[in-house]
Amino acid sequence: MLDFLAENNLCGQAILRIVSCGNAIIAELLRLSEFIPAVFRLKDRADQQKYGDIIFDFSYFKGPELWESKLDAKPELQDLDEEFRENNIEIVTRFYLAFQSVHKYIVDLNRYLDDLNEGVYIQQTLETVLLNEDGKQLLCEALYLYGVMLLVIDQKIEGEVRERMLVSYYRYSAARSSADSNMDDICKLLRSTGYSSQPGAKRPSNYPESYFQRVPINESFISMVIGRLRSDDIYNQVSAYPLPEHRSTALANQAAMLYVILYFEPSILHTHQAKMREIVDKYFPDNWVISIYMGITVNLVDAWEPYKAAKTALNNTLDLSNVREQASRYATVSERVHAQVQQFLKEGYLREEMVLDNIPKLLNCLRDCNVAIRWLMLHTADSACDPNNKRLRQIKDQILTDSRYNPRILFQLLLDTAQFEFILKEMFKQMLSEKQTKWEHYKKEGSERMTELADVFSGVKPLTRVEKNENLQAWFREISKQILSLNYDDSTAAGRKTVQLIQALEEVQEFHQLESNLQVCQFLADTRKFLHQMIRTINIKEEVLITMQIVGDLSFAWQLIDSFTSIMQESIRVNPSMVTKLRATFLKLASALDLPLLRINQANSPDLLSVSQYYSGELVSYVRKVLQIIPESMFTSLLKIIKLQTHDIIEVPTRLDKDKLRDYAQLGPRYEVAKLTHAISIFTEGILMMKTTLVGIIKVDPKQLLEDGIRKELVKRVAFALHRGLIFNPRAKPSELMPKLKELGATMDGFHRSFEYIQDYVNIYGLKIWQEEVSRIINYNVEQECNNFLRTKIQDWQSMYQSTHIPIPKFTPVDESVTFIGRLCREILRITDPKMTCHIDQLNTWYDMKTHQEVTSSRLFSEIQTTLGTFGLNGLDRLLCFMIVKELQNFLSMFQKIILRDRTVQDTLKTLMNAVSPLKSIVANSNKIYFSAIAKTQKIWTAYLEAIMKVGQMQILRQQIANELNYSCRFDSKHLAAALENLNKALLADIEAHYQDPSLPYPKEDNTLLYEITAYLEAAGIHNPLNKIYITTKRLPYFPIVNFLFLIAQLPKLQYNKNLGMVCRKPTDPVDWPPLVLGLLTLLKQFHSRYTEQFLALIGQFICSTVEQCTSQKIPEIPADVVGALLFLEDYVRYTKLPRRVAEAHVPNFIFDEFRTVL
């Protein structure tokens, strides 16, 4: 009959593909369960209030039109719904595809069973497949994996969350319109079961059997699979466990399968007493906590509580005397085997001869160790015992007492067993690889000894007192030939013949009285020794390695091992060289990967890489978690060193009086520093002893592990320092900003110095790591803060700054800001608020409008540079950009609402437009016309002024940041600054040349050069924030005249001061001139330049008309508003760096030249 798993066996390949797919689906479900967007849980009140109206469970399907009409009625809900869709559609689709694949899996399995019944596969029926060893295994696994999938989904992804995700996918995707979509079936299968994985939650009735029956499966198939599992040893595991007391461990995998599959036929659990007795007697006579898949544990006492037959059958196992007997037995066994293992692990004990002579003894010891570890770990696990269940608690307490359970001793046994196993495996692999070479070597040596003896008895080679003996000579030559004729490939015959040859050599020594000659005896003894070695060597079989692999399975502890983490870390802290022993434990744990990967590998599935990457990644993350204690301990020592260096140790001057030498020696503190530094070196040594290890398919380099660990600890501490250091009290007078920045600067400097100090002792690039990680922390926090302003947010798993191995911690927000960078930015905006302060441009300083005290100055930005570095300033700049964009967008919507929808305002603007046309003319009776228009539009200017001033304020801050960045760049990196400036000029020259002659080259749209250079230029402060286009705009009617009216409406609130320029007239009606000018300038910059032209023309016309009206008076005096308008034009020209003729096109130059002299 054709091999069932052969590539040309369609029947075997079809079921193998299904099972392979099942293992891949479970890995995907486990992977996705870590990425459930928190919003779908609707746990906190804020989420419920915000998203409660757009996230629905299956009640949505009762009347989708009703829900959608509610959404359509509120534009703000529609907007939120669209934003939610954009942010979550990718992850929701991924979840939906996983759910769909679960449904497809069971549909495929049902179709395969139908095909078997209908005879699609020639000569194959369900019965014949179950008779085949591989077929039987695969059919049992196929049903079992489906059950595991359902249990994993319910455990890891709550029912309500599943429903909300499915409804969201239905609403946001094209699934509803797709005719071939099986959305309905998926929803029926995965609707909420009412199960909750929270401790103490009540189990729903008929759970999980009703859940398992949502998709009908062929009943005869289920009962045949249960029959096979009850009667057969389907994986032939018993041969690896010959002792009867190990029987339940040998059948543990099969027991887990049977446990899951019984839920497909719950009548057995409920009423079939005899069957349940048989199952319990065979699989659970001495155990009741089982691992069902990759460490997911189940306690049968709890799981079988609702089923009468199952519960009754289990009572024998749970009898107090049996529990006591098992616990005492495993306590005794673990003590005995631990002593044995420690003996085996003594240096020089496990030699090749000893191992080869004692294979059964060593394997028995390994079996006992692993069985004891398994039983004790499972039955004492917290996860398997619900603290609210009195009976479970009693059983567990009984076990802890009778087994004299000590987690440290159990962990030590696990460590030693893993180390013993590892050494044995390595020795066996080495012996197997050298097996043939050694055997041939021994054969050659033995044969040569016989030839030499033959020569001795021929009389040719004289040997003291050995007479010539032709018979012996011929006999020894024959023996030599016989030894040479032994064939390695026919090991059985060779072994038998070798034993005969050894007997013959013993007999010849006796019959021919050869004992009298010591040299002949020595030759014979050597040959016998070589023949013995040949027998030993030929007996080195791969079966031993296979048995060790089966016996050493640690997949049941995939999750339980986490409960030993604190013990592992404490052991490492006390003795860093412990890491070498842990390496063997991690490798033992890695063998758990064989379980899900075996079928995927057999099926040559492309999923092999992603599944093995997932499980290997999980294990490597665990290794990192355990070893993180080393960087943590290093940093603890490091902080002590820094404290000693900064507070206790006095710096030695370059010249020193001899008698003061003792004062500066400070032997105590220096010894303390040396001791702590030595401790850091010991920790480094500990982790580097681990050697490069392949964990699953991921290569773990201890040096990289150490560096990542140091980075992780640094990130954790720096992020916390930044979070804690930048929390402000908005009511504090004066502001806490500068003192807090100085304090944080000192903390950051301490970290920086400590890193410089440590780098040589742990062999890392301290400065490089410091800069990379601090920049990552700041950039990530800026990204999170900017998410507030983005419709499509950057999720953690999409962020280029966030990392799984070296995560940046997130802290609960303490105010409206999400992160410390937002708090810093808002505090700066608060203290430089144009309503409270007055900015003096020449001094780069802000003063309080009422008290005239200095509030802050450009020193603030050099302090931020010192504390947060270039990244901090650059991040602040980026955040301000987002805020300006938001402010400008708000402004535009306000413009639409207040101006373009107000009839009165429009009529006023129309009248004014007619009065001032053409713009080059002088307006007659100008005062009346202008002030009448201002009076009619008075109500709109308050909101207008606030928006303009906010934008202006942020632009001033951006200018200050650019100045600071540019100054420090020229100072610290003059070559970079020069290179960037030259490249920028060259690019601009090329672009200008292209516009004059389009045949010349120009960067295409797909060329990223301009984007990349912009990022560099902004980081180096080589840019002008006033020239930036923040938003795209459409044409707006009345825009220039509205801005003109706005400006002249503000002029009466200001007055000219010869020393300071334009200042606020009354603090009660606050207006600050620089933010006003820069805000207007920025706003106009967003629109077509013709709007600016019209705006400037209107100001020019206002100046000329007002001056014309003044000159008709007896004593002509230049009005204050005209002075303000002229100063605006002057500042406009200065800020935009345009030639003065731009202003002179609208105002005669003599007015510009002379107006200051008149004042």
Curated annotation (Swiss-Prot):
GO process terms (BP): actin filament polymerization; endosomal transport; endosome fission; endosome organization; lysosome organization; meiotic spindle assembly; oocyte maturation; polar body extrusion after meiotic divisions
Residues bearing the modification Phosphoserine: S917
InterPro entries listed in its UniProt record: WASH_strumpellin
Transmembrane regions listed in the UniProt entry: none
GO cellular component terms attached to this protein's record: cytosol; early endosome; early endosome membrane; endoplasmic reticulum; endosome; neuronal cell body; WASH complex
Free-text tissue specificity from the UniProt record: Expressed ubiquitously.
Pfam families referenced in this protein's UniProt entry, alphabetically: Strumpellin (PF10266)
Protein localization: Cytoplasm, Cytosol; Endoplasmic reticulum; Early endosome
Keyword entries, A-Z: Cytoplasm, Disease variant, Endoplasmic reticulum, Endosome, Hereditary spastic paraplegia, Intellectual disability, Neurodegeneration, Phosphoprotein, Protein transport, Transport
Subunit structure: Component of the WASH core complex also described as WASH regulatory complex (SHRC) composed of WASH (WASHC1, WASH2P or WASH3P), WASHC2 (WASHC2A or WASHC2C), WASHC3, WASHC4 and WASHC5. The WASH core complex associates via WASHC2 with the F-actin-capping protein dimer (formed by CAPZA1, CAPZA2 or CAPZA3 and CAPZB) in a transient or substoichiometric manner which was initially described as WASH complex. Interacts with VCP, PI4K2A.
Disease: Spastic paraplegia 8, autosomal dominant: A form of spastic paraplegia, a neurodegenerative disorder characterized by a slow, gradual, progressive weakness and spasticity of the lower limbs. Rate of progression and the severity of symptoms are quite variable. Initial symptoms may include difficulty with balance, weakness and stiffness in the legs, muscle spasms, and dragging the toes when walking. In some forms of the disorder, bladder symptoms (such as incontinence) may appear, or the weakness and stiffness may spread to other parts of the body. Ritscher-Schinzel syndrome 1: A developmental malformation syndrome characterized by craniofacial abnormalities, congenital heart defects, and cerebellar brain malformations. Facial features include prominent occiput, prominent forehead, low-set ears, downslanting palpebral fissures, depressed nasal bridge, and micrognathia. Cardiac defects can include septal defects and aortic stenosis, among others, and brain imaging shows Dandy-Walker malformation, cerebellar vermis hypoplasia, posterior fossa cysts, and ventricular dilatation. Affected individuals have severe developmental delay.
Protein name: WASH complex subunit 5
Species, as recorded: Homo sapiens (Human)
Gene name per UniProt: WASHC5
